[in-house]
Amino acid sequence: MFSINPLENLKLYISSRPPLVVFMISVSAMAIAFLTLGYFFKIKEIKSPEMAEDWNTFLLRFNDLDLCVSENETLKHLSNDTTTPESTMTIGQTRSSTQPPQSLEESGPINISVAITLTLDPLKPFGGYSRNVTHLYSTILGHQIGLSGREAHEEINITFTLPAAWNADDCALHGHCEQVVFTACMTLTAAPGVFPVTVQPPHCVPDTYSNATLWYKIFTTARDANTKYAQDYNPFWCYKGAIGKVYHALNPKLTVIVPDDDRSLINLHLMHTSYFLFVMVITMFCYAVIKGRPSKLRQSNPEFCPEKVALADA
């Protein structure tokens, strides 16, 4: 009568076919990996690989800039009714425009204002300003923040609107100027091609951002990371000045993620692949339980021949 001993057959199968056992284990591990990856895509938001740059990565580029506010710079008075030049479009005008995208390149530079953290770290000789400094402005080129291609040569005007006046009152109070941290309104003025085309950060309004009654702005020189670590680095680059640093905190809402439909499709493909691999492993396992040890085992010695052994015995 035909009988099957599953455990004995499985032991014989494992001992007689080690490579196939290793293959089964590898396929099982791959199936588990695909299953885990599919579940990960289902529950997690994944950054889209098709979008090379979003506003998070763009604003992080400014973290590498050093801004020098020199004590010798001339203050320029601003009136509260200062308006944006006619040659510059605000981002609101750009959004409401019905022009096709290709005409934006001919419309001139645009303004985009975002809130950002600005740290001003005065050096010891710096004595501060007697006037209320509310605006810092600078001009850089695209390559200074790591842009490439045509955008590397584009000019970017940066204006920081401080929420409160920055003057020498605190310097006189403490005997020296201390580091100050502002949540400033940074206005970037550049060609439309410089900016990412993804979801934009919340905007601030420079004209109503500062509570000072008298406005003064001062020019700052910018230095990128490549210049800072170059061999001809000047240690007295910002002597008798204050070094400004920009800090952007990552905003998850600005990251472009893979759409839900695409994530579901990826999850479905990974699940189908893992199921197929599991079926393959289960099939081989059932075969091992039923078949057991093979009927004929090949000898490890290639010179072994049963016919020759029989003739020798005769």
UniProtKB/Swiss-Prot annotation:
Family to which the UniProt record says this protein belongs: Belongs to the TMEM248 family.
Region (Disordered): 78-106
InterPro entries reported for this sequence: TMEM248/TMEM219, TMEM248/TMEM219_dom
Biased composition (Polar residues): 80-105
One Pfam family recorded for the sequence: TMEM219
GO CC terms: membrane
Cell location: Membrane
Membrane-crossing residue ranges in chain numbering: 21-41, 179-199, 270-290
Keywords: Membrane, Transmembrane, Transmembrane helix
Keyword Cell inner membrane: no
Biological classification of the source: Eukaryota, Metazoa, Chordata, Craniata, Vertebrata
Membrane topology reported for the UniProt record: Multi-pass membrane protein
The protein's name: Transmembrane protein 248
Domain of life: Eukaryota
Keyword Transmembrane helix applies: yes
Main location: membrane
Signal peptide residue numbers: none
Organism: Rattus norvegicus
